[in-house]
Amino acid sequence: MKVLVMNCGSSSLKYQLIDMENESVLAKGICERIGADGSVLTHKPTGKDKYVVEQAMPDHGVAVQLVLDALQDKEHGVIESADEITAIGHRVLHAGTIYSDATLVTEDVKKVVRDCFDLGPLHNPANLIGIEACEKAMPGKPNVAVFDTAFGMNIPKKAAMYAIPYEYYERYSIRRYGFHGTSHMFVSGETVKLLGKEDAKVIVCHIGNGASISASIGGKCVDTSMGLTPLEGLVMGTRSGDVDPAVLQFICNHEDISVDEMLNILNKKSGLLGISGVSSDFRDVRQAAADGNERAQLAMDTYKYRVAKYIGSYTAAMNGVDAITFTAGVGENAPDLRKDICDYLGYLGVELDEEKNENVHGETTVISTPESKVKVIVLPTNEELAIARETAKLV
């Protein structure tokens, strides 16, 4: 079985073709600047040279067809015909309260995706366009929607609810959903396998430019740091994370700006960028801190402290923890971040093997000592494989 995994953004389309027999990537690539000048497809077949196509892509339909052409190209392709593709798995951001698992795409499913445009205004419209483009390009092929919110949909209601009038939950489905769900599902599941303990209590720290933490027992989510939107939770590259809601009114009144403008500030001008004034990139802020920039150092300290605080909170929520797993761009590649966070966790019996922590090279690595009461792990996320697995289950 071969599964084509699609992740459609407003002007981009990322893809991987995965052979599920051995879970190997046959090819991957990205279409960029869809609907704009300078559209380009970068296609990388495994074991072959990269293939770049500069061609107008006025819409996602054209992009999907170019992807199929590249996959079947005589020199750079990996399949003889699109008939070899069994199904298409799509990353879809939001399903509201309707779906807590991956699902075969039907007209009803597309309506749910459409109805959630206001909950995922940047992603859901593009996700739906990608689904419909694939339906048109490959009629009759099953499409599967794998929702980013699905993993967090099953958290206990006490963890999901905001303490606001209940009618807002009933009327608008306002609750905590969580995001990065496909990554958390994959990493927590792989951690459970690694531990060999079916009911393992796992905290996953997905730390990239966007960042979130989840708590799970036996691979089932019990809490997660992002909320109705990805703005809640950790300090991120440009997002504030947790903030007193009254701050919005205070700044709006004093700066004479609208709520929408204030939300834009919290989403795009806050986080590491907001505190440091240097950059939203962890590496740039870390370097500025090392060079003596006090605001950059404060940004780094706040960033790490928030992670450690959530780990403590989730340890309490699960009445213990067996493993803490770091993943995503920063989590996988910043040994100093991992060390500084683990320095907060001595009360849990966490002991880091500093040599192992400094020598992680893109593979799953246990970086705690054998004596550590909690395993600390670095585990590369693989959202595409997770989507392919969910797709394969349904077709």
Give the ranges of each region predicted by the language model.
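Extreme N-terminal starter segment of soluble prokaryotic enzymes
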Residues: 1-4
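Short glycine-rich, Thr/Ser-proximal phosphate-binding strand/loop in the N-terminal lobe
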Residues: 12-57, 227
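Phosphate/pyrophosphate-binding loops at sites that engage ATP/ADP/AMP, CoA/4′-phosphopantetheine
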Residues: 70-85, 191-196, 311-322
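Short beta-strand-loop/turn "lid" adjacent to the catalytic site in phosphate-handling enzymes
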Residues: 71-123, 144, 150-159
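Glycine-rich phosphate-binding loop of actin/hexokinase-like ATP-binding domains
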Residues: 151-254
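Catalytic phosphate/nucleotide-handling subdomain of diverse soluble enzymes
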Residues: 217, 223-258, 264, 328-359
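Adenine-nucleotide phosphate-binding core of ATP-dependent small-molecule kinases
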Residues: 264, 271-275, 282-317
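Internal helix-turn-beta structural module
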Residues: 297, 301-322, 331-395
